[in-house]
């Protein structure tokens, strides 16, 4: 899938008829926009389209003036110059707009006191997020309350007292900022990893913003799990231009882009490929088209590409690629593994097709290996579940047992299987490629188990850098961090899908920066959530019968199992035709969809 088609896919998010609290926005759409947070508020000095509130309207009543002020506050240009026009001259000079940036919705402006020339209002709202330096969005949940005072000056109301920091109405924030992903490298240097940011400003300033943020590096929580070839003193020399050197409309329409880097250390061909992949996928994801002419101190960055790079030159690291297209859909049907085609289902050869006692299973990314959780059939207090591992068309061996084992999930290189055992222990099963021998090691999941009692779902992202989990019915994302000595830990878990409204039952990765969640609800049983928690989209519910008990996904298609069948949703269908369709051979039976991962 191309960045353009992915963007189009996301623009078709569906508004639920009976919306979740978090899905309801002033504009009526069931989500925040696509991506993480904006650039550090109060630090952006550039030309921008500007707020639609150019200056305070004459004769405005104080409560309406406050609402105009919140609207103007979403324009960060020149330290929120548009918003400062609503302040008295003295307060305008003192206001610390960079102290914080709080995103709220359902803003109430409540009168507290009012005289002929003084007025005080209480501002109450729902807090939904915080903007942090570097454009990082942190999802939050709670109430927000503050007081703002105004006074009459020259016949016009102006704000005379307000808290430090910026208050951003979510609907206005979404009109001003866009979510764009920076791309860093996984530890093995085999793919790029998204780090969503929110940026504002004109499209012709987007390339400069994104490359600057890329050079600054990943957010702190992600830093231990990724690499950045643009670190170590790399900077941009001169302005970023179109490929032919023109300085107007850079990054807009055709004409490509040229970036002259300086401070680039000596690199071999592979390192240059990784460097270019970070730059190209960051720009391509932001709808900045190539060719991408990359220079180092005025000379071609790589002599193989003197006229510029294209996305085809770094296609092996495409963050939108998926292995499921080549491996195909499988399913767990009545306890057995079957392959699924347009004409029906076929039991797979070997143990996994013959067994009748499997509860969940996972295919490796290349489709050659299988891990499954099987029912032991033994009475309590004996372990009820066994984790079976084997080749696709061969036998299987039990590698561990437990009272409960989550659906397994494979590491991207197919070398390890992850699962949660008994709700509170996360393990990795290592498999030697040559011999097939397995060993079980624990993962440090203390940061996750501190959040709740029971882990019921664990899914690794396709780049292997993040883990999506369900803990006590809530959705969390953690960073997969390799510690000194080779051990792994799940670090910095953060709640996403805040305000989900009903317990999460199942989840899976759709793209590298979105997950699909099935929840215990009949009105909107399936939603799509951004990794930074900034966005939640209601997926269509037509044809589904609650509860939806399982979900599996690729970049192009979601599959779910409800109480009577397995359904698929094609992300490329037109919005009016986008609904769940039954998968042949998986209707009227107990079945769960299975894609690689």
Swiss-Prot record:
Lipidation (S-diacylglycerol cysteine): 29
Primary localization: membrane
Taxonomic lineage of the native organism: Bacteria, Bacillati, Actinomycetota, Actinomycetes, Mycobacteriales
Residue numbers with lipid attached (N-palmitoyl cysteine): 29
Subcellular locations according to the entry: Cell membrane
Pfam families in the record: Germane, Gmad1
Chain segments carrying region Disordered: 39-59
Protein name, per record: Lipoprotein LpqB
Membrane topology annotation: Lipid-anchor
């Amino acid at each position: 899938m191309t960045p353009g088609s992915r963007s189009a896919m996301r623009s078709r998010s569906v508004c639920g008829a009976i919306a979740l609290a978090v899905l309801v926005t002033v504009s009526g759409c069931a989500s925040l926009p696509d991506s993480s947070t904006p650039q550090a508020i109060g630090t952006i000095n550039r030309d921008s389209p500007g707020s639609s509130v150019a200056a305070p309207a004459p004769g405005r009543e104080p409560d309406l003036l406050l609402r105009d002020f919140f609207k103007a506050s979403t324009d960060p240009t020149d330290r929120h110059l548009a918003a400062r026009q609503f302040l008295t001259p003295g307060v305008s000079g003192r206001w610390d707009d960079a102290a914080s940036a709080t995103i709220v919705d359902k803003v109430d402006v409540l009168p507290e006191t009012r005289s002929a020339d003084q007025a005080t209002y209480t501002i109450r709202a729902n807090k939904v997020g915080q903007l942090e330096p570097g454009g990082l969005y942190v999802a939050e949940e709670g109430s927000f309350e503050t007081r703002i005072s105004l006074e009459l000056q020259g016949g016009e109301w102006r704000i005379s007292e307000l808290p430090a920091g910026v208050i951003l109405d979510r609907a206005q924030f979404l009109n001003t900022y866009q979510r764009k992903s920076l791309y860093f490298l996984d530890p093995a240097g085999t793919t790029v990893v998204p780090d969503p940011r929110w940026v504002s400003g004109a499209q012709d300033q987007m390339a400069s913003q994104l490359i600057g943020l890329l050079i600054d590096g990943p957010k702190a929580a992600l830093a231990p799990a990724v690499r950045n070839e643009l670190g170590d003193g790399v900077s941009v020399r001169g302005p970023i231009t179109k490929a032919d050197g023109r300085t107007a409309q850079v990054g807009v329409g055709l004409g490509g882009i040229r970036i002259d880097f300086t401070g680039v250390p000596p690199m071999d061909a592979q390192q240059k490929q990784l460097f270019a992949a970070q730059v190209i996928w960051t720009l391509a994801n932001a709808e900045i088209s190539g060719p991408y002419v990359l220079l180092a101190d005025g000379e071609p960055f790589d002599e193989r590409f003197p006229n510029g790079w294209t996305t085809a030159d770094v296609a092996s690291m495409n963050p939108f690629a998926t292995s499921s297209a080549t491996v195909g859909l499988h399913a767990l049907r009545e306890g057995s593994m079957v392959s699924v085609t347009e004409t029906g289902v076929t039991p797979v050869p070997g143990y996994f097709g013959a067994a009748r006692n499997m509860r969940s299973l996972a295919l490796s990314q290349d489709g050659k290996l299988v891990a499954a959780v099987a029912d032991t059939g033994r009475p309590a207090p004996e372990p009820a579940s066994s984790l079976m591992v084997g080749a696709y068309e061969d036998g299987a061996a039990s590698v561990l047992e437990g009272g409960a084992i989550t659906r397994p999930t494979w590491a991207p290189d197919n070398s390890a299987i992850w699962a949660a055992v008994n709700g509170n222990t996360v393990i990795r099963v290592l498999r030697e490629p040559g011999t097939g021998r397995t060993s079980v090691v624990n993962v440090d999941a203390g940061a996750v188990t501190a959040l709740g009692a029971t882990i019921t779902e664990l899914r690794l992202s396709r780049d292997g850098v993040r883990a999506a989990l369900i803990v006590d019915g809530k959705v969390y994302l953690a960073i997969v961090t390799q510690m000194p000595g080779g051990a792994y830990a799940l670090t910095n878990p953060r709640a996403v899908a805040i305000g989900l409204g009903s317990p999460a039952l199942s989840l899976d990765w759709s793209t590298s920066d979105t997950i699909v969640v099935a929840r215990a609800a009949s009105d909107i049983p399936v939603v799509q959530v951004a990794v930074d928690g900034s966005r939640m989209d209601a997926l269509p519910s037509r044809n589904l019968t609650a509860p939806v008990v399982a979900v599996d996904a690729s970049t192009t298609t979601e599959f779910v199992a409800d109480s009577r069948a397995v359904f698929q949703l094609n992300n490329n269908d037109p919005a009016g035709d986008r609904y769940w369709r039954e998968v042949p051979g998986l209707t009227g039976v107990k079945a769960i969809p299975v894609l690689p991962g």
